């Protein structure tokens, strides 16, 4: 908790508020309403930062199919401070990805456990959630990627079944 507080607090009212702890998992709430679940596990040689936003494809309106998934892809395109997020994560040896589902979108990275890597991951996530660069040429190329992923899913009987089940 201390490294999180050190990274993201400019003054006392910005400090995460403790909500509760259940079976070693501490829940904190930031001033902006973001929920933080902190689960230290000193037996693991890695640190994982996973952000989940409760917005997904079911929140898309008519004519917006695929927009949540497209935005997920676009947030890997970089920021002014970090123009090559995937390259930076790869250089640090991270495993990373993002996923979109009906009711959520998440982004995660797993790195070697260190205060430096934890600080990097939290800082990088905060930066890309606010300062992502969304360029027309990137939108065009990622629309093709997302469309191809969607079409592959249309040919999967399991995916079609799941979509029909969850659409009710």
Where are these regions (language model features)?
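M16/insulysin-pitrilysin zinc metalloprotease superfamily fold
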Residues: 78-79, 110-143
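Mature N-terminal segment immediately following signal peptide/propeptide cleavage
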Residues: 18-52
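Histidine-acidic residue clusters that define the catalytic metal-binding segment
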Residues: 11-27, 107, 167-168
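Acidic/histidine-enriched alpha-helical segments
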Residues: 87-90, 133-151
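M16/MPP (pitrilysin/insulinase) zinc-metallopeptidase core fold and M16-derived inactive scaffolds
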Residues: 48-112, 155
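Scaffold signal of the M16-like zinc-metallopeptidase fold and its non-catalytic homologs
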Residues: 4-7, 11, 74, 79, ...
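Solvent-exposed coil/turn segments that connect beta secondary-structure elements
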Residues: 31, 41-43, 52-56, 79-80, ...
């Amino acid at each position: 908790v201390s490294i999180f507080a050190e990274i993201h607090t400019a003054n006392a009212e910005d400090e995460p508020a403790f909500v509760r702890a259940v079976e070693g998992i501490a829940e904190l709430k930031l001033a902006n309403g973001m929920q933080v679940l902190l689960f230290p596990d000193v037996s693991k040689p890695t640190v994982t930062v996973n952000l989940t936003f409760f917005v997904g494809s079911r929140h898309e309106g008519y004519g917006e199919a695929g927009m949540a998934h497209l935005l997920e892809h676009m947030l890997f395109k970089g920021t002014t401070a970090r123009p090559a997020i995937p390259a930076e994560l790869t250089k640090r040896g991270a495993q990373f990805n993002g996923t979109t589902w009906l009711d959520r979108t998440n982004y995660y990275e797993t790195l070697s456990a260190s205060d430096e890597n934890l600080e990097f991951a939290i800082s990088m996530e905060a930066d890309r959630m606010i300062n992502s660069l969304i360029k027309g040429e990137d939108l065009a190329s990622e629309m093709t990627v997302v469309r191809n992923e969607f079409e592959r899913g249309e040919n999967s009987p399991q995916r079609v079944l799941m979509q029909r089940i969850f659409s009710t």
